[in-house]
């Protein structure tokens, strides 16, 4: 049974070996590489901008930032009241 199953596998491997190596891809020339750089930089910049905006929005919407902002507001009002009552 194993011998019968291994024959098709052997035939496929033999066909792949006899096919030979795949043709090599042509190396891109320098001019085409240099022409693609601005597009890649623009794509990179937009990706970074999108991730940065997402991170900033996430920070703004987080509970920690809201609590911190409230704490600073309360502290400022307390200091302001103390300053007004003292002077």
Swiss-Prot record:
Domain of life: Eukaryota
Pfam families, per the entry: ApoC-I
Alphabetical GO biological process terms: lipid transport; lipoprotein metabolic process; negative regulation of cholesterol transport; negative regulation of lipid catabolic process; negative regulation of very-low-density lipoprotein particle clearance; triglyceride metabolic process; very-low-density lipoprotein particle clearance
One Gene Ontology MF term: fatty acid binding
Ribonucleoprotein listed as a keyword: no
Signal peptide start and end residues: 1-26
InterPro entries given in the database record: ApoC-1_sf, ApoC-I
Location(s), subcellular: Secreted
Presence of the UniProt keyword Heme in the record: no
Similarity field: Belongs to the apolipoprotein C1 family.
Function: Inhibitor of lipoprotein binding to the low density lipoprotein (LDL) receptor, LDL receptor-related protein, and very low density lipoprotein (VLDL) receptor. Associates with high density lipoproteins (HDL) and the triacylglycerol-rich lipoproteins in the plasma and makes up about 10% of the protein of the VLDL and 2% of that of HDL. Appears to interfere directly with fatty acid uptake and is also the major plasma inhibitor of cholesteryl ester transfer protein (CETP). Binds free fatty acids and reduces their intracellular esterification.
Protein name: Apolipoprotein C-I
Organism of derivation: Pteropus alecto (Black flying fox)
Gene: APOC1
């Amino acid at each position: 049974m194993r011998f019968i199953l291994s024959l098709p596998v052997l035939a496929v491997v033999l066909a792949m070996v006899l096919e030979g190596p795949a043709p090599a891809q042509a190396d891109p020339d320098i001019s085409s590489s240099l022409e693609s750089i601005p597009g890649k930089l623009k794509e990179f910049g937009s990706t970074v901008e999108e991730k940065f905006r997402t991170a900033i929005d996430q920070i703004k919407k987080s509970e920690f930032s809201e609590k911190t902002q409230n704490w600073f507001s309360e502290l400022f009002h307390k200091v302001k009241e103390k300053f007004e009552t003292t002077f």
